[in-house]
Regions:
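Amphipathic, charged-and-aliphatic alpha-helical interface segments
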Residues: 57-61, 82-101, 122-135
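A positional/architectural concept
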Residues: 1-76
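Glycine- and Gly-Pro-enriched alpha-helical subdomains that act as flexible
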Residues: 110-113, 123
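Strongly charged, low-complexity linkers/loops
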Residues: 125-160
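Small-residue (primarily alanine) positions within well-ordered alpha-helices
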Residues: 85, 120, 154-157
C-alpha cells in the first residue's frame, strides 16, 4: 500500500489533484473536505489509500490520517464503495460523520446523496463500535499530546 505521497502540487480540483513526486505525476482522487483543507502551497504531503481492482488501480487522498481511517471503515461496509465513501466525506466532515455514526443519527447519514435508509442503518450497525473505539483512541492521543512535557513543567516551576 502507498501510505502517503509527498511532492509538488501540479493541479488541484474539487475531485482530484495531481502531485509530482520526483518526476512521476500521481492522479489522486480527493473529497471536498480534503480540497478545502489543502492550501495552494507548492509542496504537500497527502495520505493515501490504494484501491486495486482488476481493471484499475485508483489512489484516494486525504488531508490527514483520521480522514483516511474513516474512509477505510466506510468501505468495509457492504454496499459502500470507495466513491460512495468519498461522497460521504465530501458531504460531511470526518468528525461529523463519526459523530453521526456514534449517535445513531440516521437522518444525517441519509442526507448524503446516494445513501438511503437501509444503507445508513447498515453503516451505523457495522461501524458504531469501531467509531466509539476510534473516538476513545483519538481522545487519549489528544490528551497525551496536550499534557505538558517535562521540559515545560520544569520551566514553569522555575518561573514561580
Amino acid at each position: 500500500m502507498i501510505t502517503h505521497l509527498q511532492g509538488r502540487l501540479v493541479e488541484k480540483t474539487p475531485t482530484y489533484l495531481v502531485i509530482d513526486c520526483n518526476g512521476v505525476g500521481y492522479w489522486v482522487n480527493i473529497s471536498l473536505h480534503t480540497f478545502s483543507q489543502l492550501s495552494d502551497t507548492q509542496q504537500l504531503k497527502i495520505y493515501t489509500y490504494l484501491q486495486i481492482k482488476e481493471d484499475a488501480h485508483t489512489l484516494f487522498g486525504f488531508f490527514d490520517k483520521f480522514e483516511r481511517e474513516i474512509f477505510s471503515l466506510l468501505i468495509s461496509v457492504s454496499g459502500v464503495g470507495a466513491n460512495t465513501a468519498r461522497v460521504m466525506l465530501s458531504s460531511l466532515s470526518p468528525a461529523q460523520l463519526q459523530s453521526a455514526i456514534v449517535n445513531s443519527d440516521v437522518r444525517t447519514i441519509q442526507s448524503v446523496k446516494g445513501i438511503g435508509a437501509k444503507t445508513a442503518q447498515r453503516i451505523i450497525l457495522d461501524l458504531k463500535e469501531k467509531m466509539v473505539k476510534l473516538t476513545s483512541d483519538n481522545a487519549s492521543l489528544v490528551a497525551a499530546s496536550q499534557s505538558p512535557s517535562s521540559k515545560e513543567e520544569a520551566l514553569a516551576a522555575l518561573e514561580v
